[in-house]
Swiss-Prot record:
It comes from Chlamydia pneumoniae (Chlamydophila pneumoniae). PROSITE patterns: DNAJ_1, DNAJ_2, ZF_CR. SMART domains: DnaJ (SM00271). The gene is dnaJ. Zn(2+) 1 binds at C161, C164, C214, C217. This is Chaperone protein DnaJ. Disulfide bonds: none annotated.
Length: 392
């Protein structure tokens, strides 16, 4: 029996040509289209077996070099115990070949929008289940987010059972392969033209049955646990960011890997600084005299080594003006330098003045010139044409 002849293709056929030929023949000889036809059933098994081998690069190479008795053939050759020994295997191959067309892992998933899991279908025929991922929230001060910090978290979940090493049974002889599904965890049923796989009712999809369960985990292979996890928080994190710690979630079952731990960051606000990306904003209130004459002012920073820096405020500065102090902002979480410190000037008008202070201001006002207030002059010039009573 030549697999290429069975599918009606040449030995140089591409993977796409192999799949196309198989699909055409599989639909033609499918048992649901040929009920009670033993010859069609035999042909269906043959084309499924041929596709199973030729669609796998390793198996195809072995078949091309050694024939049906190659090293990937299994105990009975490609067509024996390792091939399409029963209709269930042939139907599973059929579903797998058509599943990719619908973006899923099975024909049933593709047709019904990935509802296979809802009906008990499993993509892991050996019953292995990856552990669930966990998520925790961690609160940081503004300074911790700026400088980075090490934290210890207590996480509840499942760990692998130490008594049975996660196997569910201390003695390997206490575990046997499920006879109903032959260790696959699934049984295949034909309904009309369609075939679908469902969870094996005998083993619950595990593919095995534990006859002598471990006393510590009761055959589950894992136990509840609380553990301390060390977390490195890099400098520059912000609220809403998420750190992924691979393998720190719940332990998997039946040899599957553990899930992951996701640490969600919440950063407290700061009484002085406001963050905008990697930049910091500092609102600096100054008196109108300092604004008019200019000054030098010591302002706080987040840098541990300095703690403050000297800012030069130029004379005649206006409220709302932003002065930039480079590299005094937040560190970039990806290590790409630091942001800037943006100092927003807020000129404060004096209140609760004494009579002496008021008199001094009146004296100053009497000496004002138009060039002292260019914005005021510009505004008055603009509205003069509309309101005749406005005077400079």
């Amino acid at each position: 029996m030549d697999y290429y002849s069975i599918l009606g293709i040449s030995k140089t056929a591409s993977a796409e040509e192999i799949k196309k030929a198989y699909r055409k023949l599989a639909v033609k000889y499918h048992p649901d289209k040929n009920p009670g036809d033993a010859a069609a059933e035999k042909r269906f098994k043959e084309v499924s077996e041929a596709y199973e081998v030729l669609s796998d690069p390793q198996k195809r190479d072995s078949y091309d070099r050694f024939g049906k008795d190659g090293p990937f053939a299994g105990a009975g050759g490609f067509g024996g115990a390792g091939g399409m020994g029963n209709m269930e295997d042939a139907l599973r191959t059929f579903m797998g070949a058509f599943g990719g067309e619908f973006g899923g892992g099975s024909f049933f998933d593709g047709l019904f929008g990935g509802l296979g899991e809802a009906f008990g279908m499993r993509s892991d025929p050996a019953g292995a289940r990856q552990g669930a991922s966990k998520k925790v929230h961690i609160n940081l001060t503004f300074e911790e987010a700026a400088h980075g910090v090490e934290k210890e978290l207590v996480v509840s979940g499942y760990k692998s059972c130490e008594t049975c090493s996660g196997q569910g049974a201390v003695n390997p002889q206490g575990i046997k392969s499920c006879e109903r599904c032959k260790g696959s965890g699934q049984v295949v049923q034909s309904r009309g033209f369609f075939s679908m796989a469902s969870t094996c009712p005998e083993c619950g999809g595990e593919g095995r049955i534990i006859t002598d369960p471990c006393s510590s985990c009761r055959g589950q292979g894992r136990v509840k646990d609380k553990r301390s996890v060390h977390v490195h928080i890099p400098a520059g994190v912000d609220s809403g960011m998420r750190l992924k710690m691979e393998g720190y979630g719940d332990a998997g079952q039946n040899g599957a890997p553990s899930g992951d731990l996701y640490v969600f960051i919440d950063v407290e606000s700061h009484p002085v600084f406001e963050r905008r990306g990697d930049d910091l904003i500092l609102e600096l209130p100054i008196g109108f005299v300092d604004a008019a004459l200019g000054m030098k002012k010591e302002i706080p920073t987040l840098l541990k080594t300095e703690g403050s820096c000297r800012l030069t405020v130029p004379e005649g500065i206006q409220s709302g003006t932003i002065l930039k102090v480079r590299n005094q902002g937040f560190p970039n979480v990806h290590g790409k330098g630091r942001g800037d410190l943006l100092v927003r000037i807020s000129v404060e008008t004096p209140q609760n003045l004494s009579e002496e202070q008021k008199e001094l201001l009146r004296t100053f006002a009497s000496t004002e010139k138009a060039e002292n207030f260019p914005k005021k002059r510009s505004f008055l010039d603009k509205i003069k044409g509309f309101f005749s009573d406005f005077t400079v």
